[in-house]
Amino acid sequence: MEGSLEREAPAGALAAVLKHSSTLPPESTQVRGYDFNRGVNYRALLEAFGTTGFQATNFGRAVQQVNAMIEKKLEPLSQDEDQHADLTQSRRPLTSCTIFLGYTSNLISSGIRETIRYLVQHNMVDVLVTTAGGVEEDLIKCLAPTYLGEFSLRGKELRENGINRIGNLLVPNENYCKFEDWLMPILDQMVMEQNTEGVKWTPSKMIARLGKEINNPESVYYWAQKNHIPVFSPALTDGSLGDMIFFHSYKNPGLVLDIVEDLRLINTQAIFAKCTGMIILGGGVVKHHIANANLMRNGADYAVYINTAQEFDGSDSGARPDEAVSWGKIRVDAQPVKVYADASLVFPLLVAETFAQKMDAFMHEKNED
């Protein structure tokens, strides 16, 4: 009896390890990565992300979601729908999908600025939302460069040398001095126009004015004002722009920025859109400002988040798209995607697989307009 037991594995262990599987649905996707025996083909490599698993698969789903936005956007409007374009109170022509793009300031500090500028230059998005740094860093780069450094550089030594660190990017403090010299006369002019012409300034009007004044095609906001793409920044004073406005208020007080008018305008963009898509890089105010505008239409039809934030602390930055569904900020029948990744790595690849592939279609739309 003892010999027999030694020759047979325990039945309970066998049952636990070799448990029977239910059959998966026939449409289930098999995991398969890119085969480099095919040579180096970057399009095929990025397409293979979709079946690789983990965040690579989320990236593949984000590509599908953004392409769905674009396909909808390029659909022609009926004549009746086109006549209601003025309801958005925007100078932009209404399309079949209004795309909101939000991004945090560090992405403009980085080389993602050039990716965002490409989208704005070619009229591929309709509404921008960013923070103060997301505006000023673009303008400052037109005046002086940002440099690569190291995450490990010591703050004490950098401060002694007048160098500011943004992750592994370095911004000489002299850049902000040049920004002040450029900005102060514009603020003087804005105050004069407010007092003599009755101009009612808002953050979006101010950003458009700065984009016009910088007059540099390397700038995101040069192209935004040129293409009538509104830029909303409800926290416009939270950065160097705010510092300069503060200093200017002593020299030439009285400038007023009306955020209520901008609130009406961004919400109106969502309310009267045929459908909407959200692409949000990072979290915080840019993420929620776009999502809350889309609440006014019972949610966005398409949504892609790219950030590294987690939801366990209850922050809006880390909240998954499904939380936004519960608030009515994304529609219940939508298929939103969150990619848990650094946007500086992922976003250019996403644009390469989506907007950049549709360049000819966007150029055709522009020529027709």
From Swiss-Prot:
Subunit structure: Homotetramer formed by a dimer of dimers.
A GO CC term assigned to this protein in UniProt: cytoplasm
Annotated organism of origin: Homo sapiens
Binding-site residues, spermidine: 136-137, 243, 288, 314-316, 323-329
Reactions this protein catalyses: [eIF5A protein]-L-lysine + spermidine = [eIF5A protein]-deoxyhypusine + propane-1,3-diamine
EC number: 2.5.1.46
Name under which the protein is recorded: Deoxyhypusine synthase
Pathway annotation from the record: Protein modification; eIF5A hypusination
Active site: 329
Variant or mutagenesis effect after changing residue 329 to A/R: Loss of covalent intermediate formation and deoxyhypusine synthesis
Effect on the protein of changing residue 342 to A: Strongly reduced NAD binding. Strongly reduced activity
